[in-house]
A protein has these predicted regions:
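Extracytoplasmic small-molecule ligand-binding "clamshell" domains
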Residues: 30-103
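A ligand-binding cleft/hinge motif common to bilobed small-molecule-binding domains
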Residues: 87, 102-112, 160-163, 187-223
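Ligand-binding clefts/hinges and TM-proximal coupling segments of bilobed small-molecule sensing domains
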Residues: 22-25, 76-79, 156-176, 215-217, ...
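Periplasmic-binding protein-like
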Residues: 43-44, 122-130, 200, 208-247, ...
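Acidic, polar ligand-binding/catalytic clefts
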Residues: 79-143, 215
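Bilobed "Venus flytrap"/periplasmic-binding protein-like clamshell domains
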Residues: 45-47, 58-72, 127-181, 200-202
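C-terminal motif of bacterial Sec signal peptides marking the signal peptidase cleavage site
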Residues: 15-19
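Extended ligand-binding regions for polar small-molecule ligands
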Residues: 21, 63-64, 68-73, 135, ...
Length: 270
C-alpha cells in the first residue's frame, strides 16, 4: 500500500496548522464547588464539531453536546482540552483526559484501548469527496483507481480505506496528515489529492465556509455513528451517568436541536 505524508513543501499555499498537537482548557460549566472535574478531549480547529470561537471559547456540535450533558450531571464539572485528532486519542490513552468527544466512530483498534459510550449522538455516513471542477465525482472506492486520497491520521476514514487497500493493494494512494478544514479543502481543490472522505454535512460546511463546490458520491462508502469515548480507567458510574444523560437529551429533542444548529439538519441516530 502506498503511504504518503504531505509536507509543507508539497502544499506551499496552505496555512501552517496552528495549535495542532497543543492543548488548551476551558470549563464547560461552573458546577458545584465539590463537583468532580472531568477533562474532556476535543478539537480546537474542527468545524463544525469542536473549535475555538472568536472569543477563544470552545464551541461546535460535539462541544455543545458535552455541555448539555454537563448541565444534567451536577456531581461533575467538565473541562475541555483541545488538540488535533490523533493527539486527543493519545491524551485519552494516557489519561490526560478521561473522556473524548471528537466524532469517534467504532473500530476494533479503539475498542481494545478505550471504552465507548452506549449512545450514538451523530450519524457518520462517509462519502468520497472531490472537486468536480478539477476532476471527477467518485461513487465508490473502485472509482479511485490510481488516485490520491487524503485521510486524517488515526481516523476511521483512514482505517476503512486501509481495509480496502489490504484486499486491493495499490488500488489508490493514501495521503496522511493532520490538516485543518482549510488545508483539506485546498488539498482537494488544488489537485494535490484527488479526493478525501467525509460525511455530507462536513462537505456542506466546507463549501459554505470556503465558497467551494465540492461534491460527494451518490452513495456512502461506509455507514456508522459517532460515540463518546472514555479512558479504560474512567469510573464506570460516571460513564453510566453520561450514557443516561445523553439518552435523555436525545429523547427530549435537545440533541436534535443542536444537530440542526451546528450541522444544518437532523443527523441524530435512532
Amino acid at each position: 500500500m502506498k503511504r504518503t505524508i504531505l509536507g509543507a513543501s508539497t502544499l506551499v499555499t496552505l496555512l501552517v496548522l496552528g495549535a495542532c498537537g497543543s492543548s488548551s482548557a476551558d470549563t464547560a460549566s461552573s458546577g458545584a464547588s465539590d463537583a468532580t472535574e472531568i477533562k474532556v478531549g476535543t478539537g480546537n480547529e474542527a468545524l463544525p464539531y469542536a473549535y475555538l470561537d472568536e472569543n477563544g471559547e470552545y464551541d461546535g456540535y460535539d462541544v455543545a453536546v458535552v455541555k448539555a450533558i454537563d448541565e444534567k450531571l451536577l456531581d461533575y464539572t467538565f473541562t475541555f482540552e483541545g488538540a488535533d485528532f490523533p493527539t486527543t486519542l493519545s491524551n485519552l490513552e494516557s489519561n490526560k483526559v478521561q473522556m473524548a468527544a471528537y466524532e469517534y466512530e467504532v473500530n476494533d483498534e479503539r475498542k481494545e484501548k478505550f471504552v465507548y459510550g452506549d449512545v450514538g449522538y451523530v450519524v457518520w455516513d462517509t462519502y468520497i469527496v472531490s472537486d468536480p471542477d478539477a476532476g471527477t465525482v467518485y461513487d465508490s472506492f473502485e472509482d479511485l483507481a490510481g488516485k490520491k486520497v487524503y485521510v486524517t491520521t488515526a481516523t476511521n476514514q483512514a482505517a476503512m480505506a486501509e481495509a480496502y487497500l489490504a484486499e486491493n493493494p495499490d488500488a489508490f494512494e493514501l495521503v496522511y496528515g493532520e490538516y485543518n478544514n482549510e488545508q483539506i479543502v485546498q488539498a482537494v481543490t488544488s489537485g494535490a489529492v484527488d479526493a478525501t472522505l467525509a460525511p455530507e454535512y462536513q462537505v456542506d460546511n466546507w463549501n459554505n465556509s470556503f465558497s467551494e463546490n465540492l461534491e460527494i458520491g451518490s452513495e456512502p462508502v461506509h455507514n456508522s455513528n459517532a460515540y463518546l469515548l472514555f479512558n479504560k480507567e474512567t469510573d464506570q458510574d460516571f460513564i453510566d451517568a453520561v450514557n443516561t444523560a445523553l439518552e435523555e437529551l436525545k429523547a427530549d429533542g435537545t440533541i436534535k436541536e443542536l444537530s440542526e444548529k451546528y450541522l444544518d439538519g437532523d443527523y441524530v441516530p435512532e
